[in-house]
């Protein structure tokens, strides 16, 4: 399945299907900042916010990580996973420089299948190969309780709606 989002107003195709409310989240294995493999199942029993974005080295993506880091400190039994195509070194450098410790960064470095499975694989245009901007919120049993594929990649996600799903 292919969906369309926009980058600076221009349409770009995104492969796969974003999980929808009521779906069971597919397990995945991504790469942590220490280069270890981390699976969704590593966070069993916890609620999860998947903040998915193209690159931590862009202003909007960096802003989303900062915002979710701030919000994560207020959430009980919840982990915020910030997922991008960046190398784990870049993710670690950014969070270290910014003093961000409430989120967990994960890279698609060895988990390219995640992009297709979660419907965020940008397949054309200048961002081809990166992940589209999306937020998926899971309950403690990995059921999707909120899902947003951001239409314009250069805008931030709807933080309030994502948080409302956790209330």
Swiss-Prot record:
Annotated active site: 61 (cysteine sulfenic acid (-soh) intermediate)
EC class: oxidoreductase
Domain Thioredoxin: 19-167
Transmembrane segments annotated in the record for this chain: none
Known EC number: 1.11.1.24
UniProt keyword terms in alphabetical order: Antioxidant, Disulfide bond, Oxidoreductase, Peroxidase, Redox-active center
Molecular function terms from GO: thioredoxin peroxidase activity
Matches recorded under CDD domains: PRX_Atyp2cys
Cystine pairs: 61-95
Misc: The active site is a conserved redox-active cysteine residue, the peroxidatic cysteine (C(P)), which makes the nucleophilic attack on the peroxide substrate. The peroxide oxidizes the C(P)-SH to cysteine sulfenic acid (C(P)-SOH), which then reacts with another cysteine residue, the resolving cysteine (C(R)), to form a disulfide bridge. The disulfide is subsequently reduced by an appropriate electron donor to complete the catalytic cycle. In this atypical 2-Cys peroxiredoxin, C(R) is present in the same subunit to form an intramolecular disulfide.
Subunit structure, as described in the record: Homodimer.
Record PANTHER family: THIOL PEROXIDASE
Protein name stated in the entry: Thiol peroxidase
Protein species of origin: Yersinia pestis
Gene from which the chain derives: tpx
